[in-house]
Regions:
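Conserved N-terminal phosphate-binding loop of PLP-dependent enzymes in the Aspartate aminotransferase
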Residues: 1-133
Length: 133
């Protein structure tokens, strides 16, 4: 609920991280109103809205990302600030990725964000093929 979320934000809050569709909690999608409300709240508070799309990204919801599925019937320009991705990105081959809007890219510099899957040529080749499909 947006009121509870707003009441938990303080001057130490830098981001909100959510799953657009909770996979482990019973495949429960967020409502369009909630996602749009979170975007507005994050913009007002100058904090990042981040999505965990490990479970429900890459067409598992019928759209490239879960928020696109949830908001498909609403005219909007919604976009999260960052998205974590894995699992279906590699079609069963281990890979993970972290996407961030260009305006926030300066928050990460070389060496600040590492990965145990980073740079694997097989995984990267498969992920590029999946993204091309």
């Amino acid at each position: 609920d947006l009121n509870s979320m707003e009441n938990t934000i303080d001057d130490q809050t830098s981001a909100i991280l959510i799953e657009g569709i909770q996979g482990e909690g019973g495949v429960t999608p967020a409502t369009p109103e909630y996602l749009l409300g979170l975007r507005k709240l994050c913009d007002e508070k100058n904090i990042l809205l981040m999505f965990d799309s490990v479970q429900c990204g890459h067409f598992r919801s019928g759209r490239f990302q879960s928020y696109q599925r949830i908001l498909e019937d609403i005219e909007n320009t919604f976009q999260p600030d960052a998205i974590s991705m894995a699992k279906s990105l590699g079609g069963g081959i281990p890979i993970g990725a972290f996407w961030v809007k260009e305006k926030h890219s300066s928050l990460l510099s070389a060496g600040m964000h590492g990965t145990t899957y980073g740079g694997n040529p097989l995984s990267c080749s498969i992920a590029l093929t999946i993204l091309d499909v």
